[in-house]
UniProtKB/Swiss-Prot annotation:
Molecular functions per Gene Ontology: ATP binding; ribonucleoside triphosphate phosphatase activity
Record keywords, A-Z: ATP-binding, Hydrolase, Nucleotide-binding
Organism superkingdom: Archaea
Family: Belongs to the THEP1 NTPase family.
UniProt organism field: Picrophilus torridus (strain ATCC 700027 / DSM 9790 / JCM 10055 / NBRC 100828 / KAW 2/3)
Enzyme class: hydrolase
Lineage, broadest ranks: Archaea, Methanobacteriati, Thermoplasmatota, Thermoplasmata, Thermoplasmatales
Name of this chain's protein: Nucleoside-triphosphatase THEP1
Length: 180
């Protein structure tokens, strides 16, 4: 099974491409599970991050400025319990039920807790189609490990290719284009 990474600039084009890919996979009857991360920005300032279980739609705002925590993402305090309460059940269920597993913002999420890191590492070893979004410049060990896995294709999304990339990725997932 192919593992796809989508990298790109900060902003919404990764999320838009991922949403399009998920829509096309759902139209093919694929069971898609995992989690999505969204950010809330006001006046060009990052306010918070939320995480959502794709299947149950359960959502939590897990990172904000006013959360006091040793764990931080982009200077925001992280409520690790809220994050674990969504990410871990979502990925546990996906391991057995999903055709395609989504891990959004791999570089930001996996180092928040040992439990999250462990389940993400387990999921990445599965023989399933996995789509992750990655921060473009991250030197994170988990990202390096992801890039070194077998049958991984990493696509860099840009404003120029953002409309065609979802179709190209779908072809790779469906085995219509060589993945190595």
């Amino acid at each position: 099974m192919v593992k796809v990474g989508i990298t790109g600039p900060v902003g919404s084009i990764k999320a838009e491409a991922l949403a399009k890919i998920m829509e096309m996979l759902a139209n093919e009857g694929k069971i898609i599970e995992g989690f999505l991360v969204s950010e809330k920005v006001e006046h060009n300032k990052l306010i918070s991050y939320s995480v959502m279980d794709i299947l149950s739609k359960k959502k939590a705002e897990f990172a904000r400025q006013d959360i006091v925590s040793r764990v931080k993402i982009d200077k925001l305090g992280v409520d690790t319990r809220l994050l674990e309460d969504i990410v871990i059940p979502s990925l546990e269920r996906a391991k057995s039920e999903a055709d395609v597993i989504i891990i959004d913002e791999l570089g930001k999420i996996e180092n928040t807790t040992k439990n999250i890191k462990n389940i993400i590492e387990d999921v990445l070893k599965l023989d399933k189609t996995i789509i992750v979004t990655l921060h473009k410049k991250s030197r994170n060990p988990v990202l390096q490990e992801f890039r070194s896995l077998e049958s991984v294709r990493v696509f860099d999304i840009t404003p120029i290719n953002k409309n065609i990339l979802p179709f190209k990725i779908l072809k790779v997932i469906n085995g219509e284009e060589e993945s190595i």
